[in-house]
């Protein structure tokens, strides 16, 4: 079984004016597709890896032969991260219920959570991601990872751990056509397109 580019559950212009059509289309069909294609070259050479989901593979990169481990960390990581990212975007959803209560419990308020998340996204040097994760102790935390690392890879690999609830891509390819060097503006725009329904479902799944 090879990896495939997931279809988006919305049109490329569905998140306008916050995320623009051109960026969404290029990001999905060019950048994400490249991660899929690259990861599939390893699955072709090592077909025993094809039985694992991309999430299970990046949770235990020791499954991958040493000479391809960094390559798959980057490319399988990119496939997993982007697959989560697309599902996590939607106009018009609201943070409610158990997830909102847990955010208020662990951060003090929703605004305090947003401040921490924005800081993690803005201060990630170079390329990477900001995440809201559920830790093993049952508490929510904000973390960031470099490049295409995921919290699923664990502290030893990515410097972060936890089950991803919300993720934001802060690679320049995610925002540069619309926002140029104004990463903080892109981060602020993200709050208009977070799919809180998907986040709540992931939180319920992870609990």
UniProtKB/Swiss-Prot annotation:
Sorted alphabetically, which keywords does the UniProt record give?
A: Manganese, Metal-binding, Oxidoreductase
Q: Which reaction does it catalyse?
A: 2 superoxide + 2 H(+) = H2O2 + O2
GO CC terms of this entry: cytoplasm
**Annotated PROSITE patterns:** SOD_MN (PS00088)
State the InterPro entries in the record. Answer: Mn/Fe_SOD, Mn/Fe_SOD_BS, Mn/Fe_SOD_C, Mn/Fe_SOD_N, Mn/Fe_SOD_N_sf, SOD_C_sf
Q: State the EC number(s).
A: 1.15.1.1
Alphabetically, the GO molecular function entries are:
metal ion binding; superoxide dismutase activity
Q: How is the cofactor bound?
A: Binds 1 Mn(2+) ion per subunit.
Q: Which cofactors, if any, are listed as required?
A: Mn(2+)
- Residues bound to Mn(2+) are 27, 82, 169, 173
ATP-binding recorded as keyword: no
Superkingdom of source = Bacteria
Q: What does this protein do?
A: Destroys superoxide anion radicals which are normally produced within the cells and which are toxic to biological systems.
PANTHER family named in the record: 37S RIBOSOMAL PROTEIN S26, MITOCHONDRIAL (PTHR43595), SMALL RIBOSOMAL SUBUNIT PROTEIN MS42 (PTHR43595:SF2)
Q: According to its UniProt record, which protein family does this protein belong to?
A: Belongs to the iron/manganese superoxide dismutase family.
Protein name in UniProt: Superoxide dismutase [Mn]
What species does this protein belong to?
Yersinia enterocolitica
UniProt gene name: sodA
């Amino acid at each position: 079984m090879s990896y495939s580019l997931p279809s988006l559950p919305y049109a490329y212009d569905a998140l306008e004016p916050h995320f623009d059509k051109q960026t969404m289309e290029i990001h999905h069909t060019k950048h994400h597709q490249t991660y899929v294609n690259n990861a599939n070259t390893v699955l072709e050479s090592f077909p025993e890896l094809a039985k694992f989901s991309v999430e299970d593979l990046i949770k235990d990169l020791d499954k991958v032969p040493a000479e391809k481990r960094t390559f798959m960390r980057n490319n399988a990581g990119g496939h997993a991260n982007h697959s989560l990212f697309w599902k996590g975007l939607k106009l018009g959803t609201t943070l409610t219920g158990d997830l909102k209560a847990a955010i208020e419990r662990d951060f003090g308020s929703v605004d305090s959570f947003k401040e921490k998340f924005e800081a993690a996204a803005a201060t990630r040097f170079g390329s990477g991601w900001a995440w809201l994760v559920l830790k093993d102790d049952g508490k929510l935390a904000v973390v960031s990872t470099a490049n295409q690392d995921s919290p699923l890879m664990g502290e030893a690999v990515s410097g972060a751990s936890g089950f991803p609830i919300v993720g934001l891509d802060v690679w320049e390819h995610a925002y540069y056509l619309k926002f140029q060097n104004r990463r903080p503006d892109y981060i602020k725009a993200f709050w208009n397109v977070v799919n809180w329904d998907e986040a709540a479902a992931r939180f319920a799944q992870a609990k």
